[in-house]
Amino acid sequence: MNKNYDYIIYTDGAYSMKNDEGSFAYVMLDGQMNYIKHFSKKIVHETNNRAELKAIIAAIYHLPEGAKYIKVVSDSQYALNTLSGKMGRNANLDLFDIYDDILSRHDYEIEYEWVRGHSGNEYNELCDKLCNDVLGYDANAEFEKYKGYKRNGKR
């Protein structure tokens, strides 16, 4: 895979069966780790796996025109393994159909990378904060310090 990524996308999803609500979020960076945009959304009547998948699908859908080399970073082994084809797709087939349809319309080369959740990875933590924020927790103040952030050459 080409290590000169056009975009690096960090994603996260969360779901509480107790409250029957959850959220998903992504943070999109350019290949030099400069902030491009973020997105988060509340969902209901879903599952944690669906939240994780929706985060990745939303990010891929919102890639700017001309993108080719993409890195997707997630703490969901389920999402990464099913989307990359390392694991069979037995559930959530509607979401896989959407993902496959998006990919069929573009010439993306996607690398999938797993990161341990809640391990201090700044962008994974930021996605987690965005998920919490959309559910009513205040993560906006925390996000402001990351806006425009550039990390020199580290990926």
Q: Where are the model-predicted features located?
A:
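RNase H-like nuclease fold core
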Residues: N2-R50, Y61-L63, K68, R155
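Short acidic DE-rich linear segments
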Residues: Y149-R155
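Structural motif
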Residues: M1-N2, R105
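RNase H catalytic domain
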Residues: T11-D20, I57-L130, V134-K147
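Short, conserved alpha-helix that lines the donor NDP-sugar binding/gating region
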Residues: E52, I56
